[in-house]
């Protein structure tokens, strides 16, 4: 767990519990180690930090828009930083994602905010295993896609059962979830549209996606219809990739290939058309039986309040449980009675412990 700016630059820290899994005594929220006092994350690029060779590695974007890698050693409480790219984009959407290759070399992926700038996807590979002190030259990927706007939100996945093929998921043109893949980190596939709108909604939606993997043969996806400010009935969906196919949580195959899924084909985990409380996905994990678990925020327009919810696939159906009320949106702009808050769907946040998803972390403003 880490503290990160969502629409502003913030101190980035890691709780001591993130590196010590003994939960006999639950930590205070203030019990964290500082990684940087000038760094931000956005919650739709993952992984933002990984644990390799008893150290934590990750990245962040600073207040000048520069991209950094970091290493944190919990045995000494010392951290190191390395600037990978200078002044890319002053925007939390530019924060990098990170993965480790089979030889423990590190790869960082990043891009500018696709809604404001049209930049490539950048990536860099460390020269040595578990080491941020030296990197190969930064590479560019320029996927050929139809539509407008740029790319952002990188999510790399490597599957050992597919000879360590690397899949890179990201927001592509027209805000649509997209995928490319590589077997050598040099040559990339043509882009694959992952999710598209149900026909009745046209092409204007922007599904927000969270991704996790067992690193072997499965990739788990949770996604929305759109941004919650754009859809009064913004619901939450689930699907899973396995053996080249897209499945529901019960294993039912809905597509023989990766891509071009519409929401009505897969599991609707939370149905906002029944409550008219729109939702936004926050995290996805799975239990020891690889049954998926999601956490998300719901927004009530009746009283302008947020709430956090936990959804678990029990092997037969999805169970949704309320965690807690979550206050209102976290930013505090100048209040004008005649002018409603435009960005009222940004919550403090809710995250799962991926080692034990019975544990979760919340923040309430």
Model-based region annotation:
Residues 2-13:
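Bacterial N-terminal signal peptides
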């Amino acid at each position: 767990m880490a503290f990160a700016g969502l629409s502003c630059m913030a101190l980035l820290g890691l709780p001591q519990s993130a590196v010590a899994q003994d939960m006999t005594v639950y930590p205070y929220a203030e019990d964290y180690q500082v990684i940087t006092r000038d760094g931000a994350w956005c919650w739709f690029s993952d992984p933002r930090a990984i644990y390799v060779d008893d150290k934590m590695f990750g990245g962040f974007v600073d207040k000048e828009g520069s991209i950094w890698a970091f290493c944190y050693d919990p045995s000494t409480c010392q951290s190191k930083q390395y600037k990978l790219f200078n002044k890319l984009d002053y925007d939390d959407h530019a924060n990098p994602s990170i993965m480790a290759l089979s030889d423990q070399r590190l790869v960082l992926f990043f891009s500018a905010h696709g809604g404001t700038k049209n930049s490539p996807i950048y990536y860099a590979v460390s020269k040595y295993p578990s080491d941020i002190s030296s990197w190969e030259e930064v590479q560019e990927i320029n996927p050929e896609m139809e539509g407008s706007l740029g790319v952002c939100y990188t999510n790399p996945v490597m599957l050992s059962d597919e000879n360590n093929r690397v899949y890179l998921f990201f927001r592509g043109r027209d805000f649509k979830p997209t995928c490319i893949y590589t077997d050598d980190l040099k040559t990339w596939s043509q882009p694959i549209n992952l999710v598209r709108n149900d026909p009745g909604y046209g092409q204007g939606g922007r599904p927000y996606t969270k991704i996790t993997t067992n690193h072997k043969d499965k990739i788990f996806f949770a996604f929305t219809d759109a941004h919650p400010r754009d859809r009064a009935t913004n619901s939450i969906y689930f699907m899973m990739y396995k053996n080249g196919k897209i499945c529901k949580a019960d294993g039912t195959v809905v597509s023989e290939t990766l891509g071009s899924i519409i929401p009505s084909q897969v599991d609707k985990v939370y149905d906002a058309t029944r409550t008219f409380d729109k939702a936004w996905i926050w995290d996805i994990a799975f239990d020891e039986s690889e049954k998926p678990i999601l956490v998300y925020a719901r927004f009530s327009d009746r009283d302008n309040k947020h709430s956090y919810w936990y959804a678990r696939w029990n092997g037969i159906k999805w169970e949704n449980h309320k965690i807690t009320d979550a206050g209102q949106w976290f930013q505090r702009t100048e209040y004008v009675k005649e002018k409603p808050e435009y960005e009222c769907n940004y919550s403090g946040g809710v995250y799962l412990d991926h080692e034990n998803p019975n544990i979760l972390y919340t923040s309430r403003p």
